[in-house]
């Protein structure tokens, strides 16, 4: 009897997002991977929660031209909440993510991946929350496929070293990926 070869399963390879395109605004920015880190005050001292543990935050990129993707989560287009942040301004220079507060539901954007493929998204919602009162769903994982973009907004709070609000844009993949 002839042996039947069992096909090997194709290993899963996570697509790495490399560029975010705000297609209707003709603006693009590179994306770099970041992780979760301890929050620190302006002097570099750890900020502690009520139990004395360091407060954890998503890393950012020190540039107005580059977005940060939380690599511990899914890539945009995979099941779950792909989180990307960027600066509204950096060292008094307007950042690429300054467009977020002007976006509207239905507006399109695209993500290019390290393999050259592209996935298109449409804005589902645009919300502004205070830094002290933004909902947990912004950073939580989900069963649906979504990309959450985050940037600062509002007045600068020098005591906290950040703006007092956050703009949160949630985008979902377009059903028709043939749209350009």
Predicted regions and their residues:
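Solvent-exposed, non-transmembrane regions of membrane-associated and secreted proteins
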Residues: 1-180
